[in-house]
Amino acid sequence: NHCLTVPMNSCSKTLPLFKVDNMAYDLKVFYTNTPPAGAYQGYGTPKGTYGLMMAMALLAEKLGIDYKDMVLKNHVEEGYMLEILKGLGEGREGAVVPVGSCGLDEAIRKGCDMIEWGKKEVSSDPDWKIGKGFAMIMQGSGLPGLDHAEAIAKLETDGTIILNSGGADLGTGLDTISAKIVAEVLKVPMDRITVVSGDTDSCAFDTGAYASSGTFFSGNASLEACKKLKDMIIKESAYQMGEDEGDLEIRFPGEVYSKKTGKVLSYYELSHTACSGGGHGQMIAHGTYITTASSVPYGAHFAQVAVNVRTGEIKVQKFYALQDAGTPINPEVALCQMYGAVMKSIGHSLYEDMKLDENGVCMNANMTDYGVPMIWEAPEDFKSVLIDVNDAYGPFGAKSISEIACNGAAPA
């Protein structure tokens, strides 16, 4: 069951947003006669974010301080030691680590400019009242110290690359991420790369596509495999070309070039010779990634909401999601992930509701009655913005992107 990990996430992925060491957290969990719950994006963090951000907004109002100024003064920044984590382990003392790459300040400032924070909006209809709000958010990139990913990269005799990745693409675009990593390291076109993923019969072990681990863990394993394969390619090329390894480099569209003599050897020629008795056999590399380092994505979500005080109708007029995902490997899909996750967040904040009878039986267990938001209920002005920072641990500086976007709608 999830009775410990979910409520612990509601604090461990919210409280570290603030530079405050004087914190306390207590929780109680209850077993109820209701349908069992499974893991879902956010995994406790949306609830904790809602509680913390609402408390901070109310505190700012009580103190007569602009919420923006309060947040900018107190949010964490790169290098700040997160002492709070010591008390947020699950059944044991947590590890204290510093904040890594963090685009939080830029996200807040840029978002406030976009939504014109401080400017009061007034509707021409007196029944409609308009308000603005925002929330800081954070999540994780897999589970450091627990997650484990592996990948195998090999050069085929036709000069193409096959990557066997244990990470499963659940619609997140992980296969494309993996292919882009191969293309970048080995300098080959995307159409000469085949990704085989999530197949336990042919792929190496991967803990799983959960907890925002795909790009960070599976991607890093693919990166490691490709780096090793690159070294093998250089070594085999030096043998076949009669060159020193230090004089060789790989270049697009998949060939080895001698800076000293100008000789060129294509991957096709290299691999064909290596597997035809004139070399040292097929080049296959195995990459493994485990880490205790934590690469946390940060963000700020902004909303402008209109409420009809006579009928209770709610309209989300504007929603701006600004997120630091490190250096995104696939920016187009990253933005799409943000839009989708924000809509889910708006859904469980405003529309969705499990109606239970006195025996705990769900009365609206279908998509018609449950209340999933429709396309016409999307914000009228809806924008996702990537805050570009470089992360020291992610593949090519990337961090996770989608799950964090479930956390901001309710408090914003």
Stretch-by-stretch model annotation:
Residues N1-G48, D125-A412:
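Gly/Pro-rich active-site capping loops and adjacent beta-alpha segments
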